[in-house]
Amino acid sequence: MQDQYILALDQGTTSSRAMLFDRQGNIVSIAQKEFEQIYPQPGWVEHDPQEIWSTQAGVAAEAVTRTGLNGTSIAAIGITNQRETTIVWDRETGQPVYNAIVWQDRRTADFCDSLKKQGLEAKVRAKTGLPIDSYFSATKIRWILDNVPGARDKARQGKLAFGTVDSWLVWNFTKHELHVTDVTNASRTMLFNIHTRQWDDELLELLDIPRSMLPEVKASSEIYGHTKTTVFASKIPLAGIAGDQHAALFGQMCTTSGMVKNTYGTGCFLMMNTGDKPIESKNNLVTTIAWQIGDDVQYALEGSIFIAGAVVQWLRDGLGIIKTAAEIEALAASVPHSDGVYLVPAFAGLGAPHWNARARGSLFGVTRGTRDAHLARAALDAIAYQSLDVLAAMEADSGLSIGELRVDGGASANNLLMQFQADLLGVDAVRPQITETTALGAAYLAGLAIGYWKNLDEVRSQWQLDRRFAPSMPKQQVERCMAGWQRAVRAAKAWADDAQ
């Protein structure tokens, strides 16, 4: 297999990307194309499934041809994707019956509330590890069946297929032959029993979704089939699938119980490997499947923070305090601390572990001496505080102590933020050389399936450190900072509750 590469396809919320990796886990080539965000009504978010496919196929070809290679140089393809986003298509024509309903879409919130009022939340969580929420795929499928003319009849006749984005890509890469998904994507639908690792008939009946619509669920690392499209002339094994955050956990080599990664993007996604048994959260975290390789299934706890890097964009676009996002580090570093200013960026409510949809963004501790730099510092601090809230919940749920925090995503390049994160946590924040961990995780899963890499130990040995941030803040100062943050969060929640 000399001079062969693994192609990782990273289908995200705003763009489709493709990366070629060599045997050492280095990026050889990269291609990216953005696509349209569709907002038919407030709270609704859609994508065109055909545009998802065309952009992903396009960048896959581009990443390969840019290096002067062709399909014969590709040993395998790994797919990672935005999770929960829901596509329903006609099995005969291959055409979607409606746009993809994106994970952020809230149109089914009222329906979710009605399910909760029926007292179903405990049952759903026990089976799936998930709360009842419009975030997940199940109620999106139900909406399509209820609102697209003729969809329910076709579904009953077995003529419709549902898939998350990974399924849709595999379906198209194999010319409508394979209808599969992996356990990680299945575990985000609110229809999959994470204990039996089967679609749950009781939940399907409850939501009136025919089982015939659903893809076959496979491991995250196995040869599912081969490409049959015009994208590549040769047949290439499709050999790895994982949802984006699961792939990032694997790319960070968080392969043993208690290891944690935090992806600092527009929001933050924190995931802890909890080993071979699911842990039910008592602190509003999500229980999910981390990945499956062969018969080995690893589970995880996950917490999502809605606004992280987005708070920096707000300082740039909303307030005009900075011209580019990169400027925030220098501005924030121009003062030694936030001078008692706390920003709670609950612009869209609070995510884990609070799950308060009504809370709104709040600023506390402002005085006549407060400057733009203090606000910039408070904004960065808020990302670290929110992450700490989730990590504390993970430790409480799992009974495991976090030894270090592996970090990736755009904002992990901010040294000031990473240092403050380590200070708050009291353990090292560790940044790898390759921060494209989502694509790397998909590449590793595909490569392991075909023997491109021999085993997990070989892959583990490739993880390389860029920088380690060790905690240096005195404990009393950390406690003062945390007490102020907790006061600010309580006040932000009280502001929302008083409006009732």
UniProtKB/Swiss-Prot annotation:
Q: Which InterPro entries match?
A: ATPase_NBD (IPR043129), Carb_kinase_FGGY (IPR000577), Carb_kinase_FGGY_CS (IPR018483), FGGY_C (IPR018485), FGGY_N (IPR018484), Glycerol_kin (IPR005999)
Task: Provide the top EC class.
Answer: transferase
Control of this protein's activity is summarized as: Inhibited by fructose 1,6-bisphosphate (FBP).
Q: Which Pfam families does the entry mention?
A: FGGY_C, FGGY_N
Q: Which residues bind sn-glycerol 3-phosphate?
A: T13, R83, E84, Y135, D244
An annotated GO cellular component:
cytosol
UniProt keyword terms in alphabetical order:
ATP-binding, Glycerol metabolism, Kinase, Nucleotide-binding, Transferase
Reaction it catalyzes: glycerol + ATP = sn-glycerol 3-phosphate + ADP + H(+)
Residues binding ATP = T13, T14, S15, T266, G309, Q313, G410
Q: Name one GO molecular function term.
A: ATP binding
Which purpose does this protein serve, as stated in its record? Key enzyme in the regulation of glycerol uptake and metabolism. Catalyzes the phosphorylation of glycerol to yield sn-glycerol 3-phosphate.
Protein name as annotated: Glycerol kinase
